[in-house]
Structures are given as C-alpha cells and as structure tokens.
C-alpha cells in the first residue's frame, strides 16, 4: 500500500514514468549497501526485536508522508527521501522476517512455512493495492499513507504479542568467526564456495531486474494505455497479487520444486510477462497479469526455499542479506531500465524487452546449472 501510494504520488507530481522508476530504485538500492551489514545484525540480535524496530520506522514514514501531503507538499524529493529511508529499513526487515519464520516453525516445517508466508504476504499485496487505489481515488494519497500507518501499528502489536520462549533458536557448531570483518565476509565466503547456490541467487537478481518492474509499467499502462487512473493501477496490482497468492499456495503444497523447477518457473515468468505486453484489450491484459503473478511467486517461493535450506543456521541471516540485495537491487536497476524504455519507446515495448531478457536469463542460468551438474557426475564417475 505504501509503495503504490508513493509511486502514484511521484507520477502525479512529475508526470514521468522515469521518475517513478527512480522512486523504485531509491527504495531498493540501499539494500546493496546495507545488505551485508544487516545480515550480521540479523544473525547476532533477536529477530523479534529487529522486526518491531523496523515496523515502527515504517509506520512513522507513512505517517510523515500523510501529514506532508495533506499540508500540500509538492517537492518530489521529499518522497524520494522517504523511499531511501524505507529501503534502508526494508534491507534489515527482509532477512530478519525470513529467518524469523524459521524460528517460528523450525527447519522441518520451513518449506511449507515459506510458501504460506509468501501467500499471506501476497494476500496483503492483493488487498493493499486494491485498498490504496480506492482510497487514493476517493481521498488522495495522504489518506492512503495515513491508512498504512494505522495498519503498521496493528502489525507492530501482533509482533509484540509473540512469546520469545516458544521460538526455535537454531545453533550451528561450525558458526562463522567472531571478529566483525569475518562476520561480514562469512556470507560471501559461504555462497562463493557453493556455485549452484550462487547461480540461483544470481537468477533471482536477474529476474528482479528484468521481471519485477510492476510499479513502473503498471502505472504507465493505467495512465497512458488504458486510461484507468489510480483505480486501474490498484486493480492491476491486485490481480497480479491474486495470481501470486495462488502461486505461493501451490509452491507451499509442492514444498520444493528443485533447480529444474526453479529455472522453469523463471523462464515462464519472463514469457508470460512478454505475452501480457501484447494483449489488445484491458480485460485480456488483466487476465494475463494473474498468470504473471502466479509464475512470479512460484519462482520466488521456490528460490527462497532453496536458499534457506542450503544455508547453515549460523550464516542464514547473512546469506539472505546477500539474496535480498541481489533480488531487490536488481529490482531497483530494473525500475530504472523499465522507466527509460517506457519513456523513450513506450510501455508495451518496455514490457516485451524486459520479459524477453528475463526468459533469456533463466535459460542461460539453467544451462550453467546443467553444466555444473554434469561436471559433478563426471567427477564422481572417476
């Protein structure tokens, strides 16, 4: 809800999809800088307290934008500043939230829990844009920010009532070194020694760059192609989240697709995005967005499960702190790319190009994973 309201406000203030792309980038680029440090924080401090702190900051940012916009603020750089602050907060919140899921259910229930957690997140992503679209259309962005601040307080209360004594605290006897530099490098060293894990994380980054550009292209489709305004923008986000909800629930039921399934879902994600760009009517476009959302969460849930299951307990936060910057940092760069393509060549062309690049990335990573598997088989045969 917060990000949709921010993106729509930037489009209102500037009239530029490229400016929306910059807003998206500013939300996610801080993760490239803060990510490795946030992983150390997540591994060393109680996740519940970290989540409460992050949620408090996010609620304050929403409340601040609500007051500023209600008072008639028009300086887009204030929104950009909020995007940066939210990006820093999210770079800590993301790894902490994922590891906290592990603490709630333990390793045995992790695959299903990741899928269910993604499903619940997508339910929020489905209701949030729909609610934001209605609120913005009826009362403006300030009301949407204020509503989100209130929801943030409710989430903070929910986290606070979780009992720490009931959590599963994993311990790894081969944990990372205790010196600060070693703690930061532990995640890098762990991932670099596991090329298949590295390739899955790289694929997430490439799909983030080429596929997860919804805030830019969906705003442009609503504004320039279908002329449906904020209500249409909210609808497009809602149906994408509906498909994502189904994808997350199915991924939770399957539990683990395996590397072939991860690569296949990534390739289909790019293909469905490309096809959505070619739809001649808004009704068909909306229908394709459901499929795009479905493939998005099939890939993301399966990739996140694979990364967490392969990471040792003592470095899980640090590994996720590398995974999220790759995924969301790619998202930031992809927002700039999609904004530039939309500005200069049109939003349909932008979606075709990024969809094709996402599909090509999946095929290349799939080939590299096949080569690694073949090499291992030959080594064992010797």
Feature-to-residue mapping (PLM):
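Alpha-helical transmembrane-bundle signature of multi-pass membrane transport and export proteins
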Residues: 1-382
